[in-house]
């Protein structure tokens, strides 16, 4: 687990901050946050006051007039239309929005979403041939198709096609009847940040404007869901759409979204972009990863409450399955990393037989969070490995793969994430090649993650009022990230692990008027480095904690470090004392790591500090006295081993490192 981070605090521009304070009447902290985001007065007005009336004319998108005419003609002639979508949340929501809209116009419309494992992303010829055979007159793609020149070319004389997409456009644009993509050449649409569902929504707007002369503003909650999930910049139109969509989600949401919110346990919360990204979107994504994405579309298009509830429950269960798959693969991957020793110093490359390919990307992201190295997770099936890559800041993983392309069967992606396939017997060779590449291209400093901090806050200035003022910048997302603050000196009043698996940490900080709660997700390691009375610096985001009618500020920890660390010193006598304590704490049977650590801190000898006492567990593991394992329910446990005979402390690397 990474403990240290590079703290990078944004510099101040007091002149610009004062201009924003004067012209826009914002709080000084809000002004600083806006300057950090390069927002001037004019942009600030649009940022803070932008509304649905500021949405751009959909006909400014190239080929929109052609697309509208073709859709209208197809509907008037009662010819069948198929929406060809994608299995991620952007594709699911784009399919749902366009389907619901075309149904409203009376269209004969259905949808087709490829199966993730067998068909993969985007258009495939076999599926289009099937649609032609079934008599489809018009295919409208959403969130895909811009790179499918050859496939479109093969069918364009037999079926009409409209491409709507938001991905980077290649030089060779498919020769469909219409191509709507704000990133293609000669498209003068001002906003280049729309998601796939955003582009589909603009098609709906254009059709509705032509039919009624009015803006189409239905289903904005679905559009917001896909926009946030696809991690596009939340500025310009995206910010307006998401802001309005969240308002709808919190007042009169789509039936399927309401049921999804209920099963996720968020029905008493005000839904934010964070809830979409971390709670709702994963449940929709799980369908495409584990089963089939059509179930997620069915949830969003149904008007039957019983059906919506049943599908929401099903997706919730599918998400649990996804989490279990992910947890199991993650644990196997961690064991693989540990067994590799120094081979994993520069790059993480792990592989396993029949690891579910739908979750290896998530596992790769978790391993980056844990070890902060470029990471490749590979699922092997029938001798072929399918890999997913995630990178670290400043390192182009696509270029790294390209340097090894002679080892790979195929690869693709971009700087931050990529995918590839490889013969399983060449994985070790790939690891060696990437290790050499990383040695040359990654500095020691780049292996230390950066926590970017917007501003320092004195601990006594943190209250609910500052949270309310900062909330003017919501919704948060890419290009408008959740503000991160720092307290550079605070004393820990208490620290404890929480959650069923004791894998989250709660730190209580002292203030002049009371205390502040701070939460660190997935950081049980803090219990071994931070103790009651420790003086720390903390980087955090802010949120409200509502409990029994009381509202208080809560710090969500991004990074926390003691200003001075206790030194670790081990002695033969000290370990003898700790052996007695640990043996009594174990009571001859398995115990949770947390319970044993609590007992150690409660009973340790006065001449041993906390870190030294807890480090004794590492010595006992190395000597085989205790063994760490994960229980069936995912909890870290210790097992006591009855060992006969004398043990030699010099066989413990930890003892040799810290002995005095």
Ranges and model annotations:
Residues 2-3, 10-138, 158, 208-429, ...:
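Hydrophobic helix-and-loop "lid/oligomerization" segment in the mid-to-C-terminal part
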Residues 73, 168-181, 339, 509-514:
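Acidic-glycine-rich active-site phosphate/pyrophosphate-binding loop
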Residues 87-91, 144, 166-167, 182, ...:
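Generic detector of well-ordered alpha-helical packing
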Residues 98, 103, 239-334, 369, ...:
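Acidic, two-metal ion nucleic-acid-processing modules in DNA metabolism proteins
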Residues 131, 154-155, 620:
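Generic structural signal for hydrophobic
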Residues 142-194:
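Histidine/acidic-residue-rich, glycine-tolerant segments that coordinate divalent metal ions
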Residues 166-167, 182, 356, 414, ...:
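Histidine-centered active-site/metal-ligand motif
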Residues 174-228:
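Short alpha-helices
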């Amino acid at each position: 687990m990474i403990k240290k981070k590079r703290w990078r605090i944004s510099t101040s521009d007091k002149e610009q901050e004062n201009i924003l304070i004067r012209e826009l009447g914002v709080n000084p902290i809000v002004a600083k946050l806006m300057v950090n985001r390069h927002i001037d007065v004019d942009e600030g007005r649009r940022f803070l006051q932008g509304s649905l009336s500021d949405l751009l004319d959909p006909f400014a998108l190239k080929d929109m007039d052609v697309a509208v005419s073709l859709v209208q003609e197809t509907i008037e002639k009662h010819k069948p239309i198929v929406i060809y979508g994608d299995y991620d949340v952007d594709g699911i929501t784009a399919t749902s929005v366009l389907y619901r809209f075309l149904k409203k116009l009376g269209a004969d419309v259905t949808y087709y979403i490829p199966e993730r494992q067998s068909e993969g992303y985007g258009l495939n010829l076999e599926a289009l041939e099937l649609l032609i055979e079934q008599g489809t007159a018009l295919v409208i793609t959403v969130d895909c198709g811009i790179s499918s020149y050859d496939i479109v070319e093969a069918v364009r004389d037999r079926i009409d096609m409209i491409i709507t997409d938001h991905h980077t456009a290649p030089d060779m644009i498919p020769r469909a009847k219409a191509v709507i993509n704000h990133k293609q050449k000669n498209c003068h649409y001002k906003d280049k940040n729309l998601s796939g569902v955003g582009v589909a929504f603009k098609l709906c707007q254009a059709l509705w404007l032509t039919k009624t002369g009015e803006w189409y503003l239905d289903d904005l909650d679905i559009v917001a869901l896909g926009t946030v999930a696809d991690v596009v910049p939340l500025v310009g139109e995206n910010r307006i759409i998401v802001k309005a969509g969240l308002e709808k989600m919190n007042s009169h949401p789509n039936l399927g979204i309401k049921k999804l919110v209920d099963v996720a346990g968020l029905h008493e919360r005000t839904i934010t972009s964070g809830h979409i990204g971390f709670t709702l979107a994963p449940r929709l994504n799980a369908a495409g990863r584990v089963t089939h994405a059509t179930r997620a579309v069915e949830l969003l298009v149904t008007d039957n409450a019983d059906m919506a509830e049943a599908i929401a429950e099903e997706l919730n269960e599918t998400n649990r399955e996804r989490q279990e798959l992910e947890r199991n693969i993650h644990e196997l991957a961690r064991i693989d990393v540990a067994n590799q020793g120094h081979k994993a110093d520069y790059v993480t490359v792990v592989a396993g037989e029949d690891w579910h390919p739908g979750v290896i990307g998530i596992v790769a992201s978790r391993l980056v969070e844990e070890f902060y190295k470029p990471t490749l997770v590979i699922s092997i099936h029938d001798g072929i490995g399918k890999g997913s890559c995630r990178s670290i800041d400043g390192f182009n993983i696509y270029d790294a793969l390209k340097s090894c392309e002679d080892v790979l069967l195929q690869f693709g992606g971009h700087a931050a994430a990529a995918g590839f396939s490889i013969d399983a017997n060449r994985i070790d060779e790939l690891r060696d090649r990437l290790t050499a590449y990383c040695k040359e291209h990654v500095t020691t400093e780049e292996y230390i993650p950066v926590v970017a901090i917007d501003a320092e806050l004195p601990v006594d200035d943190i209250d609910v009022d500052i949270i309310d003022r900062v909330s003017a910048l919501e919704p948060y997302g890419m290009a408008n990230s959740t503000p991160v603050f720092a307290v550079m000196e605070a004393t820990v009043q208490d620290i404890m692990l929480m959650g069923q698996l004791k894998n989250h940490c709660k730190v209580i900080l002292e203030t002049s008027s009371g205390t502040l709660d701070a939460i660190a997700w997935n950081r049980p390691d803090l219990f071994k480095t931070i103790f009651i009375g420790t003086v720390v610096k903390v980087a955090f985001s802010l949120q409200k904690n509502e409990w029994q009618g009381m509202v208080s500020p809560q710090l969500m920890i991004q990074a926390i470090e003691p200003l001075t660390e206790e030194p670790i010193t081990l002695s033969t006598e000290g370990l003898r004392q700790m052996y007695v304590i640990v043996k009594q704490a174990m009571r001859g049977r398995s115990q949770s790591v947390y319970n044993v650590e609590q007992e150690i801190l409660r009973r340790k000898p006065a001449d041993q500090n906390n870190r030294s006492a807890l480090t004794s567990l590492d010595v006992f593991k190395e000597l085989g006295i205790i063994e760490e394992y994960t229980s069936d329910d995912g909890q870290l446990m210790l097992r006591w081993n009855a060992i006969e005979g004398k043990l030699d402390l010099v066989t413990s690397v930890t003892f040799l490192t810290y002995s005095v």
